[in-house]
Amino acid sequence: MSEKQSNRRGFLKTSAGALAATSVLTGTSKASVPAGPSANLRIGFIGPGGRGFGAHVKRMTKLQVEGEKIELVAVCDVYNKHAERAAKYIKKETGFEPKQYEDYIEMLEKEDLDAVCIGTPDHWHAKQTIECLGRGLHVYCEKPMTKTVNEAIEVLRAWQKSGKVMQVGVQ
């Protein structure tokens, strides 16, 4: 009887293969149909400091200025200066100043959003992604998506249940 040695690389390859096969077999690629060709995608930012400002806010603002059908409607950060900087930048470039929040739950409750960009510290990614998917929002989240395997499974389940588009950025 031969014994197989388990190692991290083998575990990851096997797990990734099983996850991919499950996704293909169960048809979990369920991108929602947009509201219509004239509807703008309403986007909120959670954590528009550092990477959230440079990669998310600036890039999305540029896309809006170039004519993409998006509206940058809200920014949220517990550090007010990050939210203020993002809101001022968006207003300077687009003429519209997004609403500012300190609490992302309040932003999700008050704003009529279609999607969020998450650029908060890593330990918040899973919680915020699950919350946003549960509210029917499309999600772009900076890497890492999660800190643990259990969190990754929870995010996967939330995504499968939501039928929304989710992407994890790797710069």
Q: Residue locations for each model-derived region?
A:
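ADP-ribose/adenylate-binding Rossmann-like module
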Residues: 136-146
